Amino acid sequence: MRSTFTVVTPAADPSLLTIEQLRAAAGLVPGDASRDAELTELGARVSADIATACQIRGDGVHVPTLRSEEVREVFRQRGCDDLLFLARRFISDLTLVTEAGTALVADDTDLDAEAGLLQRISGTRTLTWPRGDAVVEYTAGFETVPPDLVGAAMDLARLRLSAAARDPLVKGESVEIPDVRTVRQDYWVGAVPGSTAGPVPADILAKLSQYINVAVA
């Protein structure tokens, strides 16, 4: 069931990589700030592309991110659903849950924090959410980015830096020396092998599998 989604408190920094990690991806020595402006922009693009690939929902105002944010969802209940599929996963704090205007306590709900699934319960029984609005406020995402997510973002950053340093249409290059320096370049015709139409290549996307949301109608 689709909800109305709002970011209440956006992440202070939506980037998955620190500037130190971006410097390392660029092969710079620690403390070398000569390319910080370029790398900060790269980090923002990489994080945004990973959020898109992972189908992270946004509110149309703030940049979607896997970093920790406080959000609010309103579900218009039909009186026949026993499970709410929250838009964000990896939930660290469930702040407020109301059903048809009545606030629930912790014992009234059961949360799968990693999957972002919320049930209405009474003891050991699962209940159906009553007709009307169900409002859920919670904090989801990472304060500290997991190492595997950092690794995938670093791989994508290195790929982007490598692509920027060469012409992707060049198939091969040869240099002849004897008289005058002669350079010959062969170009790909048609699609470039290994290229991808999406923002994240398949091998990196595979590393992100546990962070990809499943779209719910």
Task: Map each language-model feature to its residues.
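Divalent metal-cofactor coordination and adjacent catalytic microenvironments
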Residues: M1-A217
